[in-house]
Amino acid sequence: MTFNPGKKLYISDVTLRDGSHAIRHQYSIKNVQAIARALDQAKVDSIEVAHGDGLQGSSFNYGFGAHTDLEWIEAVAEVVTHARIATLLLPGIGTVHHLKEAYEAGARIVRVATHCTEADVSRQHIAYARELGMDTVGFLMMSHMTTPQNLAVEAKKMESYGATCIYVVDSGGALSMQDVRERFRAVKDLLEPSTQTGIHAHHNLSLGVANSIVAVEEGCDRIDASLAGMGAGAGNAPLEVFVAAAERLGWNHGTDLYTLMDAADEIVRPLQDRPVRVDRETLALGYAGVYSSFLRHAEVAAEKYGLSTVDILVELGRRRMVGGQEDMIVDVALDLLERS
């Protein structure tokens, strides 16, 4: 495949969805609209809006949101004129009924997310999204937990259900640059040339931007990123950093770097009640290959039971826990307590 540095990259912002994890899903309507206005002014292509765990994620298991998904989506729809509104749906958490409500509220893109080996459960949701006329994306989470070849097979399933773009999703921030390269080559070898691909990176090993650059070199079309890296764990690829790097590389990203830089520092960073950065705990996520949104839950359990957050995270990684198993964090903490 010949890399085309002149093609327009699709910039997909996730500050208002993945970024929700960083503040325990407590964005106010005022916060959401201020961030959306800045992103729209900077000309990003899409803005993802939802609870951190997707439509209907607000729950005891994942954490209750300050507002409903529909309230957030409607608030963003009021202020954007350029960017399209995206949302996230995890089969088993959100249903096709919730997807229809999100569409009616203003969402026009949906990313249907499954564990990297469970694409089968996305069939109904992808098909229904296509019926609604939505830009329908398959989102293969925790992509480090299977081989490039197996990931490609799962990507092909999502394509066969109707997804027109498939994402390699590094939910644990555990992929190396070579890992990303191998996965994109395998996936693109199996998908139709007309099917787009996307990268969703996390920064737990400080490779979020580097991995996104490698993905683009391998033909990736859509890049997820967030202002100030606002996201689960050590955050996502920081949007303003990726755009600055893309600018230096001469790539066509279509966004305004300075508007993004200002929004990151003046609007988003002040909202963080825990710094979104690589530190002892978030590094443990990437090192152990643990779902990034486990961080805040593990910190609560560690404080409650007098344990080390790192020990809890490493044990979760050893047990190969995946997204949706947040309830196991307390189980692991109690097991560690018993051993100590």
From Swiss-Prot:
Transmembrane segments: none annotated. InterPro entries: 2-IPM_HCS-like, 4OH_2_O-val_aldolase, Aldolase_TIM, DmpG_comm, DRE_TIM_HOA, PYR_CT. Keywords: Aromatic hydrocarbons catabolism, Lyase, Manganese, Metal-binding. Substrate binds at R17, D18, S171, H200, Y291. The keyword Metal-binding applies. The active site is at H21 (proton acceptor). The record marks R17 as: Transition state stabilizer. Its EC number is 4.1.3.39. Mn(2+) binds at D18, H200, H202. Belongs to the 4-hydroxy-2-oxovalerate aldolase family. This is 4-hydroxy-2-oxovalerate aldolase 4. It comes from Azotobacter vinelandii (strain DJ / ATCC BAA-1303).
